[in-house]
Amino acid sequence: CGDVKINEFINAPKDCCRPMPRYREEFLDITNENGIQDRILLLHIESSVDQVIRTSNDRTYLRIGDKSKEMLGENLRNLEYAKGSRHFEDEINQNATLEDLDQELLKAYKKRIGAENIDTHQVLAARGFIQKRDGTEYLTNAAVLLFAKNIMRFNMNCRIRFIRIDGCEMQVGANYNVVKDKSIDEPILRLVDAVKAYIVDQLRVFTKQEHGSGKFVESPEYPEFPWFEGIINAVAHRDYAASGQFIKVSMFDDRLEIESPGRFPNIVTADNISYTRFSRNKTIARVMTEFEWVRELNEGVKKIYS
């Protein structure tokens, strides 16, 4: 009877969790409180990197310190987004129709993928930008983020805020030193170029004489490729489900900072970001690749670090 009970404990993760987590059992030899030789069963449960584990009664818990907190509502959705088991870009948008999409952007997209002579609806459906729910067709959030005429109407957090600070640190109160504060709200396929043009316009240009040739050459305050790659990565991989948040570009006298909303996705950490590749928004990243902004080989981050 004892062995049967022990086996029930050992098999509990397999019998009571969906999907089954990776785990192993371990027995420790001890002397119990009665002075008798005994054993303790330990179950070592590995952290799930890319899945949300549910109990057999469809509940989800997150281990926080020495407590297990049940995840509900928005907290559960955010956990699913973080694990990559749910994707905001693939969810339907019940408020958008084909008439809300920018025809120029759609035309440019069709040209990029060699589908100029194919019906737009057919292209969007084939590429996963149209999904059916109970027999009704809806655009996905990715379609709105990429192609919307008026992105602000859909409250999609598709914004980049540029701040220029006079100095090396931001000050407040009487010493407030923000000299430029510009928000750019556009669909992704317009946002990238709009932000690039604005930042280029804000950069100081220095002139110096080359040693040897004697020619005068101009160089911008910051070289373009690292900061532009940073913006591309932020746009492609940010957490668009993070309500009310936006990408922020802060230009100081001695540096340029790019902040992207949300936590690191899935297996990416601050320590491995330079060599670990994971796309939170695979559909958006694919389209940006087709527009030759993203190469999906983690090259952008490598350029920034080099």
Report each predicted region and the residues it spans:
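Divalent-cation
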Residues: 1-60
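Amphipathic alpha-helical transducer elements in NTP-driven molecular machines
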Residues: 3-7, 37, 224, 228, ...
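Short secondary-structure junction motifs
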Residues: 20-22, 157, 244-246
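Beta-strand-connecting loop/turn residues
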Residues: 37-39, 245, 254
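Conserved DxG motif in ATP/Mg2+-binding regions
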Residues: 45, 256-261
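Active-site helix-to-loop segments that bind/position phosphate- or nucleotide-bearing substrates
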Residues: 64-243, 251-254, 262-278, 291, ...
